[in-house]
Design a protein with these regions (language model features):
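General small-molecule cofactor/ligand-binding pocket signal
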Residues: 10, 44-47, 92-94, 223-227
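Active-site substrate-recognition segment that forms the wall
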Residues: 1-12, 99-101, 106, 116-233
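Helical element adjacent to the flavin cofactor pocket in flavoenzyme catalytic cores
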Residues: 26, 30-34, 59-122, 126
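Preference for short coil/turn "hinge" residues that link or interrupt alpha-helices
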Residues: 37-40, 66, 86, 92, ...
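A generic structural signal for alpha->beta connector loops
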Residues: 6, 40-43, 90, 108, ...
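Flavin (FAD/FMN) cofactor-binding and adjacent substrate-gating region
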Residues: 3-81
C-alpha cells in the first residue's frame, strides 16, 4: 500500500530480533529453520555475536536474526497516508465515533456508536487492548498491559555512525522486552518497561532510561525529550 498509494512515512527495511541468552539464540535458530521449511520464508539471516554487535552497536546480545522482509515506519504518517488514499477512493470515515456495541443479526453486523450506526456484511475488529465490552470472545483471551517509550534528543553524527548504522529496528528477548529504532530525525525511540497503569511517573521515566543505558551506555548523557505510554494486548 505504501508503494501503491505513494505514502511518505519514513519506511525503512530490516528488523533484528536480538537474543539476551544462548538459549534464546537457539530458539531463534529453530524458529528460523521452521519458517524456511514451512513457509519458504528466506529473508531471515542468522547473526552471530560479532555481527549483531556491529549491526546494533551494543555488546549486550549473544546473537540474533535479521529479518530483511520486516522494517519500521512512522505510524502517524502511515495512518494519515491511508486516510488520504481512502478518501480518494470515496471511503467514508467517521472519526470521534465511540463504538458502544456490536450486534450480529441474521443479515448483517450492526456497529452502534455514540453518534449513529453502521451496517455491514462483515467487520474487522481491530481494537487490540481497547476492546472492553465489545467482543467477549476476544476480550477473555487477551491481557491488556501498558508499555512506555522514551525519545531522546537527536544523536550526534559520531553516535549515528556507531548505533544502528543500517537503520534497522530491534526487539529483544527480555521478559519486559526492549524495542527501539532511530527516528528519521536520528532520535533514539526506546520502548519497554511493561506495567499495568498508564500514569506516567518520574520513576517510570528513570526505569525506561535505565534500560536504554543498559543497552547503550554511550547514550547515558543524552537528554530525554519525550515520554509516552499506551496499552497493548
Amino acid at each position: 500500500r505504501i508503494r501503491e498509494f505513494g505514502i511518505e512515512c519514513d519506511k525503512k527495511n530490516g528488523g533484528i530480533s536480538a537474543a539476551t541468552s544462548v538459549a534464546k539464540l537457539r530458539e531463534y535458530e529453530e524458529n528460523r529453520e521452521y519458517k524456511i521449511k514451512t513457509y519458504n520464508y528466506n529473508n531471515l539471516e542468522l547473526l552471530d555475536k560479532n555481527s549483531v554487535d556491529k549491526e546494533i552497536g551494543s555488546s549486550l546480545y549473544y546473537g540474533g536474526v535479521l529479518d530483511k522482509g520486516a522494517g519500521h515506519l512512522h505510524p502517524i504518517k502511515y495512518a494519515l497516508g491511508l486516510v488520504k488514499a481512502a478518501e480518494k477512493l470515496n471511503v467514508k470515515l467517521y472519526e470521534r465515533s465511540v463504538v458502544t456495541k456490536i450486534n450480529q443479526t441474521s443479515h448483517a453486523v450492526e456497529v452502534l456508536t455514540d453518534r449513529g450506526m453502521v451496517k455491514a456484511k462483515k467487520i474487522a475488529v481491530c481494537c487490540n487492548a481497547y476492546i472492553k465490552g465489545l467482543n467477549l470472545g476476544i476480550e477473555n483471551r487477551i491481557m491488556p498491559c501498558a508499555t512506555y517509550i522514551v525519545c531522546t534528543e537527536p544523536l550526534s553524527q559520531n553516535l549515528q555512525r556507531e548505533i544502528l548504522p543500517n537503520d534497522y529496528c530491534v526487539s529483544d528477548t527480555n521478559f519486559d522486552l526492549n524495542y527501539y529504532r532511530l527516528s528519521d530525525s536520528k532520535r533514539m525511540i526506546f520502548g519497554g518497561a511493561v506495567g499495568y497503569s498508564l500514569k506516567i511517573v518520574e520513576g517510570l521515566k528513570k526505569r525506561t532510561k535505565r534500560q536504554l543505558n543498559k543497552v547503550y551506555p554511550n547514550l547515558s548523557e543524552l537528554k530525554i525529550d519525550y515520554i509516552w505510554g499506551g496499552l497493548i494486548a
